[in-house]
A protein has these predicted regions:
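Surface-exposed extracellular loop regions of Gram-negative outer-membrane beta-barrel proteins
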Residues: 39, 91, 102, 137-142, ...
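Outer membrane beta-barrel strand-and-loop segments of large Gram-negative receptors
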Residues: 58-70, 106, 110-114, 188, ...
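Residues that define the transmembrane beta-barrel architecture of outer-membrane proteins
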Residues: 8-14, 61-65, 107-111, 141-143, ...
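Face-selective signature of the C-terminal outer-membrane beta-barrel domain
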Residues: 5-139, 145, 150-152, 210-214, ...
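Outer-membrane beta-barrel channels and translocator barrels
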Residues: 23-25, 74-78, 122-126, 152-156, ...
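Conserved C-terminal beta-signal and adjacent last beta-strands/turns
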Residues: 163, 271-272, 277, 290-370, ...
């Protein structure tokens, strides 16, 4: 399937960080702020109904600002207290291809405060407890607690944890009417925020020559946000639109699964490892799989490092396998693998340190069909 334009993305980020070390060892206060502007463009390579070859059309214009202030206080050798404040601002401009439902600029902010305490109760038992309060401009107040318990015995670690979650709909999901490659996605101002309860059990064994780890988890979600196909209108068909979707809430959903992995260090400088991940995501309201979920996936990595006098050579190979991705809207996306190789070269000169890096991403040049790359 050929298209009349290419997608192009550009972004810039500006920000700064300040850190103040306190007299008590390992205690400090840190603040940072950053602003990111993200833009997408359609660069036309063929003449179309409304544009000529060479036209540049702004398709997305979004701004994020994030500021936070956190304090880490070592109150005792067995106790560390974390506190903080967060501010997040999101702004979304209407564009030619991503109009707003009311055709107006939209923005939203979220303020949050949190406290978390890490306590070592006994030589083998540690507890982490925390709570976060968030105030969202549109969805008001929300408290989310977390709790974890870890048992350590020699080289064995066992951790059980629980965390509540809260995620507001994005401005794109609430207000935008976006058109891309014959598809329209419509926001819904009436969306509710997602809420979740996450449970996890993790076991790790760390030896000098190898490590193994396994975990099982379950995430119960309420009002999960997902886009569904709502069918095209006669006007859509007349304008060449083949699919129309709208964001909605799923009343009940659940994601559960497990992963198991290992890493081996047979000799100095060399390491390799792999892991397998199984994920089962279900829309419990309709008793079907969650959109765009992948049941089977895995990762492989290997690296080698060697130093000769003032030169150090690093090489790393990383591979990722993704099984069939299920989609009611698009049909299943086929399983695939992606492989990267990277090298880093460190030169430790008398007064200058140089570290050039060379690598290749997607070594085997895997590409997906356009219908499986859309959100």
């Amino acid at each position: 399937l050929a298209y009349d334009y290419n997608n192009r993305h550009q972004s810039y980020t500006v920000g700064g960080t300040a850190k103040y070390l306190l007299a008590k060892r390992a205690s400090y206060i840190e603040g940072n702020i950053s602003t990111t502007n993200f833009r997408s463009f359609y660069d036309y390579i063929n003449d179309a109904k409304t544009h000529k070859t060479g036209d540049e059309v702004l398709s997305k214009d979004q701004t994020y600002t994030n500021a936070n202030l956190k304090g880490v206080f070592k109150t005792h050798k067995n106790n560390t207290l974390f506190t903080g404040l967060d501010y997040v601002f999101e702004g979304l401009e209407p564009t030619e291809t991503s109009k707003m439902l009311n055709n107006e600029y939209q923005s939203v902010y979220t303020l949050a405060a949190y406290v978390q305490d890490e306590v070592k109760l006994l030589d083998a038992i540690s507890v982490v407890a925390g709570i976060r309060y968030a105030y969202n401009e549109k969805f008001k107040s929300q408290f989310t607690p977390k709790l974890s318990l870890m048992y350590q015995y020699s080289e064995l670690n066992v951790r059980a944890s629980y965390a509540a979650g809260f995620r507001s709909p994005t401005l794109q999901q609430m207000y935008a009417v976006s058109e891309s490659r014959g598809q329209i996605t419509v926001g819904d101002p009436g969306l509710d925020p997602e809420k979740s309860n996450f449970y996890n059990l993790n076991i790790e064994y760390n030896h000098r020559l190898f490590s193994i780890a396994a975990s099982i988890y379950q995430n119960d979600l309420k009002d999960k946000i997902e886009a569904e196909d709502i069918g095209t209108t006669p006007e859509d068909i007349e304008n060449g639109i083949t699919r129309r979707r709208q964001y909605r809430n799923i009343e009940k959903a659940r994601v559960k699964g497990f992963d198991i992995g290992f890493s081996v260090r047979p000799f100095t400088g060399f390491m390799f490892g792999a892991n397998y991940i199984y994920t089962d995501g279900r829309n419990r309201t309709e008793d079907i799989r969650l959109e765009r979920t992948v049941r089977h996936s895995g990762n492989f990595n290997a690296s080698w490092r060697k130093t000769w006098n003032d030169y150090t050579f690093n090489i790393a190979i990383n591979g990722r396998y993704q099984g069939t991705r299920w989609s009611k809207t698009y049909g299943n996306a086929p399983a695939h693998q992606l492989w990267d190789i990277n090298t880093r070269h460190s030169f430790n000169l008398k007064s200058v340190a140089l570290e050039p890096a060379v690598g290749v991403e997607n070594i085997f040049n895997y590409t997906r069909s356009e219908e499986h790359t859309s959100e």
